[in-house]
Amino acid sequence: MTIMAQVLHMDSSFPGKINPPVPPSLHAKDQEAPYSVETPYGYRLDLDFLKYVNDIEKGNTIKKVPVQRRPRYGSLPRGYGYTGSWWTSTESLCSNASMDSRHSSYSYCAPGFHTSQRPNFSTARVEKTLMDARRKLEEEKDGRRFSNLGSMHSSMAGSNTSLSSAHSFNRAQGGGSYTPMSSGLSTPVSPTPAHLQHVREQMAVALRKIRELEEQVKTIPVLQVKISVLQEEKRQLSVQLKSQKFLGHTLGFNRSRPRGELYIDIPEEEAGNGAGAANKATGSLSPTTPGSLQDSGCEIEETVIVAGARPGAKREVRTVGVGPEAEERGYRQVGVGVREQDLGLLPETEALKTKVGLLEVQLRKTMQELQSAQQQVEAAQKERQTVCPQVDHAVRATSLGWQDQQGQAGAGLHTVVSFTKQPHQQRTVGIQVYTLEQPTVVGVGTLLRAQGCTHPAQLEASHRRYGESPAAGDSPHEFPIAISSKQVREVLRSEVSKSVPVTNQATPMETKCNQVTAVCQRLKEGEINQQPAEEAIQVDPANPASPQSNLRSIMKRKADGEPGSPYTKKNLQFLGVNGGYESTSSEESSSESSEDESDASEYHEATEKLPESATPQSLVSSCIPQLASETPATQTAQHSTAQIPTNHTPAAQTTSQSHTTDATTQQHVTQSPAAEADVQHCVSQSSVTTTPPPEGDVQCVFQGCNPPSTATSLEQNSVQLSSATQQSKATDSNVQPDLAQTDVSDFAAQQTTTQTQFTSAKPQQEASQSKTADLTAQKGATHSTDGSAKQDIAISSTTKPAADTATPPTNKQTDSLELSGGLMSALHILQKALSEPNAFSHQDARTAYTSVLQEWLRVSCHKAADTAVVKAHMDAFASISPQLLEFVINMADGNGNTALHYTVSHSNFPVVKLLLDTGLCNADKQNKAGYTAIMLTALAAFSSDSDLQTVLQLLRTGDVNAKASQAGQTALMLAVSHGRGDMVKALLACGAQVNLRDDDGSTALMCACEHGHVDIVRQLLSVPGCDATLTDNDGSTALSIALEASQNDIAVLLYAHLNFAKPPSPVSPKSPILGSSPPSSSELK
């Protein structure tokens, strides 16, 4: 009975279908069934037939079972009766005529349900009850059509359960299909319990299959709605793809895609929430769904309600929904594809990478072309410099060293001159030169050492014109000689010096310069007398050789040529005696080759800083060029001496270029014998003319002159070197640091074009001035009637001396300048706060501090600050207390800059001097960037010598070796990086250390190499203790940095400094090694 009581009767039409009204007579018949039960969907079913079947089964004869109840919808058990689900089918089971005849409006007969058994009902009551039940079911069906429509959205019992069952009921109603008459009604037989059990089992199987089919059919409306929604979305997407081709199209996808997902997820998300959730889903469909789809939404609502009770149905809905979800993802991917294509990020990146690669390739090609072009230019320059003289004889030079002469008090210089018949190469190992001259003259300089720093000597030799045929000579030693002078740079990489052949129309002979009696003693005492008929060496007694002297110079020059013969070519050869290097330069008859030669010998610089307490001393080195004739008359020649102390500074580089034109003119003057005699300053035996060289750098001493019939006189240039020194710091306000750096090689190279010939005997004075304000100045040489010359050197800035007027004049009226009352009040408050601990925690102290700081910076820190105003304020501060003065002048702004920082940065050195004169200024205070005022001087510009003195005072006040907090750089590194050669000299003079490293491990020398400052590299290398082998954090040395930066000149300097500091193997055991120091004055005693 419980099973049959669950049989439901569904509406036969879809919602919205108008059914005919039920006649009132049908309602009256409902009350005639006393034995009935209320089904879960609000239908009443007569129980007479059920009662009868139950009585037959149990053997009971109960006639009436009054069941009068209307079950509450909420209390109805889910799956009451069987398998946890209501039977929602309206189909009738007719698998067997003997079953308990549950009736519906549609008969579904599966082939497997038919059996061969016949019904055995024989009782008229059973037949009557069956017919009555069928009739009442039909009436109840018609009567509930309108009630179903009214209670569809308000009652669970009044809602339809399945679209498929209602549809099948409608068909069954139209066909009028009832239980066939062959069910056994004509032959009633009492059923057995086994038969009834069999019927129940068949019914259960049939119901199970029907439920499965219903579950599948229920998804049809949902799928229809989804298909409609997806079609609409497809249409919208197609329209959007056609109309929107750029970034705007993504908005359309974002609007339509979530709506489609809502439709798809209705059965999953809303099933367990009851009718309210289903109503929400229906409401979301209604705005975009046509009227027919709204009706379908009602079906969806009911389907959700039923499916909520069946997990299987819920799972099936998800499975079916996979298809539309995949399709939706397809649209989503299309949107992504369009977005990437429209943006075009990846292609643009690839295009940029391709362009970068092409540019890098082009850059490499361009760099290669540039390097090849530079190599070609260098090769062309070398070819222009290379003019190999075609002569048949050459000069051979070897070193015999310092040897003790028998009967002599000291060491002498042994020189042997010889000729060979065929051209031979020249190999110069030491300082002695074999040359073919009838009388050989050798200039010997002072052989002294100072502070262990040696300097190169210079040897200048020229040959007679080509074409003269010399006679054969006998020389016990002959070496091949390379007569080319083009390989200037290669000279530094080897120990072989290239020489130029010297030809002379003379008889072969070998002359040994033996008469050098007491040379060393006379050098020490400052006097060297000339020896007749031999080489004459003399030092002016008025200026004896100073112990601070540090250079020995040997320089020879031979200007040959018969009177009237055209001047062909001159070659200069320089041999470094002490510095361990050699350089060769040649000069053609044109100014172009002269300039090339001037650049070719700039390879090494040896400088020595003198102690500050030392007074300027002149270094004496006299060279006596003399070409003695074969006649006795010419062997006795008069002599005269002249001495000009020099200071070789970078100024020589400027002046040497200015004299290039003069040198060119001088070469043309030598075309005539008279002009040649004038240029060479040939002097008669009775009179001597001494000509001061330009800038007072070179002094020539002439030891007689040959008659014009035999040969022209040979002029010799003597290099005079002296280092400028500082005077006492405490006694002299014009203290000048030892900034004069001697550069012998540069000097020798520059003098080849400017000082080998002289066109006038007029005194000249040059004061070189450079843009970088080099701290050098030279005073003109004064010459006396007896031929002696003296020159005083002072270190000063290269700007005009008149620039001293740049200092603002002191205004006398400012002595009465009075400060405002507010400032004075703030000063007193500040003074009081200084004597109290934690006084600046009070507001009035902080206010006073701010006021004083603003006023002090306003007065002192701008570019046009007046020294008078600043001094008046400082006097006011000091009148209150020296402590307050010290506190105020060291005040710093928000960036950590003090007044000293600002004044140095603005190059307002008069105010800087005022601050430093107080003795209270903190020169080592760093700003927030980590720089001190001393470091800022690397950018300051000097306008006068007084500014220089102020800078020196600042350098002495603070720590010149302090490092910046950011990169660890020192003031010397900053000055080097900015190319401030004057500041480099000043810093070195004040004790700056050259080997300090920054945070990257770089030294000042590496900075100079990287930025290509050749002069500064020379200055740094000249400092004793400068280590060129240091490496930075990357393992790079100064030489490797110069090579990477294509600084070839610097690389040559470094190579020479590194390699020629090591002495080569000696030629003989007694001879000094090339590159080593000569005997000092103490050793010669």
UniProtKB/Swiss-Prot annotation:
Pfam families, alphabetized: Ank_2 (PF12796), KN_motif (PF12075)
Subcellular locations according to the entry: Cytoplasm; Mitochondrion
Low complexity composition-biased segments: 649-668, 798-810, 1070-1085
A single cellular component GO annotation: mitochondrion
Biased composition (Acidic residues): 589-600
SUPFAM superfamilies the UniProt entry points to: Ankyrin repeat (SSF48403)
Main location class: cytoplasm
Segments annotated as ANK repeats: 895-925, 929-962, 967-996, 1000-1030, 1034-1063
Disordered as annotated region, ranges: 136-192, 273-295, 557-736, 752-791, 798-817, 1064-1085
Compositional bias (Basic and acidic residues): 136-145, 601-611
GO BP terms: apoptotic process; glomerular basement membrane development; negative regulation of actin filament polymerization; negative regulation of cell population proliferation; negative regulation of G1/S transition of mitotic cell cycle; negative regulation of intracellular estrogen receptor signaling pathway; negative regulation of transcription by RNA polymerase II; negative regulation of vitamin D receptor signaling pathway
Coiled coil: 196-216, 356-383
Compositionally skewed regions (Polar residues) per UniProt: 148-171, 179-189, 281-295, 614-648, 706-736, 760-788
Outcome of gene disruption: Morpholino knockdown of the protein results in an edematous phenotype and proteinuria. Podocyte foot process effacement and disorganization, rarefaction of slit membranes, and disorganization of the glomerular basement membrane in glomeruli which are characteritic of nephrosis are observed.
Gene3D superfamilies: Ankyrin repeat-containing domain
Superkingdom classification of source: Eukaryota
Keywords assigned by UniProt, alphabetized: ANK repeat, Apoptosis, Coiled coil, Cytoplasm, Methylation, Mitochondrion, Phosphoprotein, Repeat, Transcription, Transcription regulation
Entries under InterPro entries matching the protein: Ankyrin_rpt (IPR002110), Ankyrin_rpt-contain_sf (IPR036770), KANK1-4 (IPR047184), KN_motif (IPR021939)
Function, as annotated: May be involved in different biological processes including transcription and apoptosis by sequestering specific proteins outside of the nucleus. Involved in actin stress fibers formation probably through its interaction with ARHGDIA and the regulation of the Rho signaling pathway. May thereby play a role in cell adhesion and migration, regulating for instance podocytes migration during development of the kidney.
Protein's name according to its UniProt entry: KN motif and ankyrin repeat domain-containing protein 2
Species name: Danio rerio (Zebrafish)
Protein encoded by which gene: kank2
